[in-house]
């Protein structure tokens, strides 16, 4: 399985996880030009949440959430501003940035961590 399909699988796991917690998925893979993409955008209790999904198959390179550094955070904030400009019906919502970290080291069951208000 290549990295792109691993990422899509992780996003699917994250989407199912969030739906099971009562979140409403608004967009998946919101992309603007070459600036990048936001994995998931969802709503929960009048909060608009921009979600970055990271996964690892081992801890050799660290925890999955450690891959969301300052540069990636800045990129996500820019994309969120563009999204809010494009879809102004969400301007009254509170905004939050979450990270879903998935560790799947070839076990039947993966470990999912939901870091709310991660940055």
UniProtKB/Swiss-Prot annotation:
Superkingdom of origin organism: Bacteria
Q: Which InterPro entries match?
A: Restrct_endonuc-II-like, tRNA_endonuc-like_dom_sf, UPF0102_YraN-like
Any single Pfam family the record assigns to this protein? UPF0102
Q: What is this protein called?
A: UPF0102 protein Nther_1376
Q: Name one GO molecular function term.
A: nucleic acid binding
Membership in a protein family: Belongs to the UPF0102 family.
